[in-house]
């Protein structure tokens, strides 16, 4: 099932602003920072134990418990309890993406025995923010709730000075994400996803592959970051970055970089062990 728009929530702007102010000074976790190019952060509001320190997602089958930070955010808690089936909630996190940051194209839950159903509620966004799934690009608007098929290759980015904040909720797995909604304004028509990106020409591709002249261990991470962002501007599948990177390293003829790229693609798209962290 592909990502799609589910409905919309009308915010109490004053109460939301109070909780967002609390989050501005809250401590965000560095868990999953190896998935980020730039500043991507998360903090846990509900999890398996209710302990703030538990910031890695694991399989479990009980309703999530509120963390200490969650208890200091009364309006966000009210939003969860009013608009979602809390008995099916397994994790609730705030995800903040800052200026010129993106998530490396990846699939989620690869390290877990069971998967979840993931919904996003947009708390703060702007026109410089976008999400991608395979070859599609879309913008999640303020107050909107989206189902994200986290098993499909996807990415997210913020190309503005104002960070993007989403409330990200993992529920027990189901084929019907709409069943988790409560008191939500339902969409009347199907949302059209307009693709504003440029065409990916042969000239652009050769320019990308030109990194083969300079790529090295010293700049590998920076080149990965550039490649991860390109599909937000050109009509390409988010997975294309791995094809480009493999060809760049092949042209360079460096066995260590070729091996590193194979490991990178395996970790983000194929398989990763529980607790495994990618360094590159």
Swiss-Prot record:
Record carries keyword Metal-binding: yes
Domain of life of the native organism: Bacteria
Ligand binding (2-oxoglutarate): 164
Pfam families membership: Asp_Arg_Hydrox, Pro_3_hydrox_C
UniProt-recorded Gene Ontology molecular function terms: 2-oxoglutarate-dependent dioxygenase activity; metal ion binding
Name of the protein in question: L-proline cis-4-hydroxylase
Gene3D superfamilies for this protein: B-lactam Antibiotic, Isopenicillin N Synthase, Chain, L-proline 3-hydroxylase, C-terminal domain
Native source organism of the sequence: Rhizobium meliloti (strain 1021) (Ensifer meliloti)
């Amino acid at each position: 099932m592909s990502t799609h728009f589910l409905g919309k929530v009308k915010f109490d702007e004053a109460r939301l602003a109070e909780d967002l102010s609390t989050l501005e000074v809250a401590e965000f976790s560095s868990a999953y920072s190896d998935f980020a190019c730039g500043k991507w952060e998360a903090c846990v509001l509900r999890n398996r134990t209710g302990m703030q320190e538990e910031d890695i997602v694991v399989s479990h089958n009980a309703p999530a418990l509120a963390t200490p930070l969650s208890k200091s955010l009364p309006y966000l808690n009210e939003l969860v309890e009013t608009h979602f089936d809390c008995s099916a909630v397994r994790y609730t996190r705030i995800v903040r993406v800052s200026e010129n940051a993106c998530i490396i194209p990846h699939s989620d839950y690869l390290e877990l025995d069971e998967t979840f159903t993931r919904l996003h509620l947009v708390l703060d966004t702007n026109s410089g923010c976008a999400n991608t799934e395979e070859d599609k690009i879309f913008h999640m608007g303020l107050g909107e709730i989206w189902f994200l098929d986290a098993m499909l290759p996807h990415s997210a980015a913020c190309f503005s000075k104002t960070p993007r904040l989403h409330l990200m909720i993992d529920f027990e797995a189901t084929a019907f994400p709409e069943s988790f909604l409560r008191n939500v304004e339902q969409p009347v028509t199907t949302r059209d996803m307009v693709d504003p990106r440029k065409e990916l020409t042969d000239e652009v591709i050769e320019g990308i592959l030109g990194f083969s002249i300079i790529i090295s261990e010293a700049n590998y991470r920076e080149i990965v970051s550039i490649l991860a962002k390109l599909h937000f501007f050109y009509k390409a599948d988010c997975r294309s970055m791995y094809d480009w990177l493999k060809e760049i390293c092949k042209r360079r003829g460096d066995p260590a970089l070729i091996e590193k790229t194979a490991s990178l693609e395996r970790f983000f798209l194929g398989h990763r062990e529980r607790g495994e962290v990618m360094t590159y």
